[in-house]
């Protein structure tokens, strides 16, 4: 195993920080893009820009793969329950773990795919349609286009708490 770059720094705490980053990034980007596939792809662009330079270098050739992964869960039949908490928690863990293993093996294409899929489940957890299963998503998207993004500085003890918090905030936004 190589002990430099991301691999030397990667541990569960770092993966958790990456997951938090995905979540916080969503809070800044999502209202302006209003939950179409373009939102997931824009989030991937922001993630790529903010990665450590060595990781960015390794994953950049596979940015399109990461974007494709970020929309993949929406193509899965019968996966709706996993787009909101608590289903998103197990999916996020699975895809982050798979991405970590692929990255450590040097399979950056697979890592990019996995991290893209994980980003989808994290960001959907914060989306009101996935928290309350509102029926009029078009109205939600129209309202979302009128919102101004805000950056939040939250601290979580673990990924589960972060996703639970996102789910609660999403439900509040449709109340």
Regions picked out by a protein language model, each given a short descriptive name:
Residues 1-13:
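N-terminal secretory signal peptides that target proteins for export/translocation
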Residues 17-28:
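Bacterial N-terminal signal peptides
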Residues 30-117, 128-175:
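N-terminal, motif-rich segments that launch catalysis or mediate targeting to/interaction with membranes
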Residues 123-127:
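Short active-site segment of divalent metal-dependent hydrolases/proteases
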């Amino acid at each position: 195993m190589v002990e430099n770059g991301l691999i030397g720094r990667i541990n569960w705490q770092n993966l958790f920080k990456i997951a938090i980053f995905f979540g916080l990034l969503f809070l800044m980007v999502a209202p302006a893009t209003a939950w179409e596939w373009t939102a997931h792809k824009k989030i991937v662009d922001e993630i790529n820009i903010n990665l450590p330079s060595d990781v960015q270098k390794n994953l950049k050739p596979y940015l399109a793969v990461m974007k494709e992964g970020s929309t993949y869960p929406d193509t899965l039949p019968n996966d709706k329950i996993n787009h909101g908490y608590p289903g998103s928690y197990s999916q996020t863990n699975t895809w982050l773990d798979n991405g970590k293993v692929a990255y450590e093996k040097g399979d950056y294409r697979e890592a990019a795919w996995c991290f893209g899929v994980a980003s989808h489940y994290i960001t959907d957890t914060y989306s009101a349609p996935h928290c309350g299963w509102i029926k009029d998503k078009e109205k939600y998207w129209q309202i979302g286009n009128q919102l101004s993004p805000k950056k939040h500085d939250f601290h979580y003890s673990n990924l589960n708490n972060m996703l639970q918090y996102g789910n609660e905030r999403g439900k509040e936004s449709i109340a």
